[in-house]
C-alpha cells in the first residue's frame, strides 16, 4: 500500500489488486424453510442493541426477518445469611433472563451460513444464542407413489 497525500487527506491506493477467487460447485445448495435464533441475555440494553444489529445485517443481505419477545424468566434463590444459625435472617437473589426470538424464512444454505457466522462473531459478552434450522428435503422415492398402486392384484381380489 502506498500513502498519497491529497489536500491533507490520506488516501489508501493499493498497488497490487488481486481479485478473490469464487468457487462454484455442482452440488445443489441446501434450502431452509425456517431459521429460528433464540438470543438470551441478562441486560436489556445489550439485548436491544444486538437485536438491532442482527435485524440490520439481515436487511442488508435481503433476508426477511421477524422478531418477537418471549416472556422473561425470573429465578429466585433464598439463602440464609448465616450458615449455621439465625433462620429468620435471609437473603434473596434473583436472575432475570430476557429472550428475543429471530425468525428467518426461506433461506439458502450459503446465505444462512454467512449470516450465522457474521452474527456469531459479533455476539457480545453475556449473550447466549440457540439456533434451530428447519431444512427442506425432497420426498423419498418409496413415499412418492401411492400405497394402493404397490399392492399386488391377488390381495385386491381376495378382499372383494
Swiss-Prot record:
One of its GO terms (cellular component) is mitochondrial inner membrane. One of its GO terms (biological process) is mitochondrial translation. InterPro entries: Ribosomal_uS10 (IPR001848), Ribosomal_uS10_dom (IPR027486), Ribosomal_uS10_dom_sf (IPR036838), Ribosomal_uS10m (IPR040055). GO terms for molecular function: structural constituent of ribosome. Keywords: Mitochondrion, Ribonucleoprotein, Ribosomal protein. It is found in: Mitochondrion. Disulfide bonds: none annotated. It comes from the Eukaryota. Pfam families: Ribosomal_S10 (PF00338). SMART domains: Ribosomal_S10. Component of the mitochondrial ribosome small subunit (28S) which comprises a 12S rRNA and about 30 distinct proteins. PANTHER family: MITOCHONDRIAL 28S RIBOSOMAL PROTEIN S10, SMALL RIBOSOMAL SUBUNIT PROTEIN US10M. Belongs to the universal ribosomal protein uS10 family. This is Small ribosomal subunit protein uS10m. It comes from Mus musculus (Mouse). The gene is Mrps10.
Amino acid at each position: 500500500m502506498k500513502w498519497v497525500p491529497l489536500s491533507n487527506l490520506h488516501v489508501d491506493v493499493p498497488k497490487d489488486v488481486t481479485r478473490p477467487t469464487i468457487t462454484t460447485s455442482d452440488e445443489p445448495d441446501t434450502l431452509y424453510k425456517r431459521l429460528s435464533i433464540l438470543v438470551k441475555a441478562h441486560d436489556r440494553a445489550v439485548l436491544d442493541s444486538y437485536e438491532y444489529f442482527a435485524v440490520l445485517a439481515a436487511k442488508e443481505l435481503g433476508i426477511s426477518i421477524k422478531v418477537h419477545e418471549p416472556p422473561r424468566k425470573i429465578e429466585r434463590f433464598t439463602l440464609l445469611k448465616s450458615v449455621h444459625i439465625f433462620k429468620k435472617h435471609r437473603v434473596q437473589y434473583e436472575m432475570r433472563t430476557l429472550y428475543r426470538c429471530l425468525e428467518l424464512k426461506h433461506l439458502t444454505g450459503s446465505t444462512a451460513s454467512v449470516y450465522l457466522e457474521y452474527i456469531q462473531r459479533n455476539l457480545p459478552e453475556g449473550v447466549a444464542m440457540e439456533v434451530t434450522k428447519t431444512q427442506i428435503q425432497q420426498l423419498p422415492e418409496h413415499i412418492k407413489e401411492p400405497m394402493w398402486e404397490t399392492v399386488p392384484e391377488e390381495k385386491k381380489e381376495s378382499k372383494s
